[in-house]
Amino acid sequence: MIRLNIMGIYLLLCDDADEARRLQASCEPVVGVLTDENRDVDFSGISYLVENPEEIDDEDYYRIWQRLKKLPWDILETERCKVRETTVEDVDSFYEIYKAPGITDYTEPLFENPEDEVQYAIDYRENVYSLYGYGIWTVLDKATGKVIGRAGLTMREGFKEPELGYVIAREYQGQGIAAEVCKAILEYGQKELGFTLIQAFTKRENLPSEKLLKKLGFTFDREELLGTEKFDCYILDMR
């Protein structure tokens, strides 16, 4: 077993499956290491397995450590905002944002029971962030650290292209923040996630959203029926 000390944290690299499971059960940040000698060994239950650990850089190891410790990844920063993965501590702020008049006119509401929203955030971390590496993230005011919205990229069931979504607190609207954050997210999607086509859905009467999408380079593609409601689908082609 190797103790890897990087960026102020440590990870344990272990090529013994039973020992790795014991360490993980003790809440130690352990990563299983596959070798030619143990390739047929059962490593089931180990959250992370790697080959050629010397080829993995410190930043990737740090992100593995964050996953094991259930800590959020920092995604990106803009001039005024920070975007990171959502935590359960953000939920109260979401309810404050969503209770403002007009916020849920074009945005799916939160659960009626905050406990359900907390559980959703936990499940989202485990089943979306950990699996895909992207999703809807939390937007913070970089100057104050205050949660001011949500934005990100998701994969809607039945569609091939990722979808841009966002909601910004009412008191922060009209300042260009949505455009600033969404532009950075689109660049992240292209450079870090390899996306070349991104879609967005908006109601025809939602003129501010339509204006923003066009400003970001989206063009109208088609009308789409989502559930029982009609939406305009816009596409951004970054090929």
Regions found by a protein language model. Give the residues of each.
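GNAT-family acyltransferases
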Residues: 6-9, 48-171, 188, 192, ...
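Acidic, Mg2+-coordinating phosphoryl-transfer loop and its flanking beta/alpha structural elements
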Residues: 12-45
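Aromatic/hydrophobic pocket-lining residues that form the small-molecule binding cavity
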Residues: 16, 118, 182
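Conserved active-site alpha-helix within GNAT-family acetyltransferase domains
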Residues: 146, 205-222
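Conserved acetyl-CoA-binding loop-helix of GNAT-fold acetyltransferases
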Residues: 166-168, 174-191, 207-215
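Conserved beta-strand-loop-alpha-helix junction that forms the acyl-donor binding cleft
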Residues: 200-210, 227-229
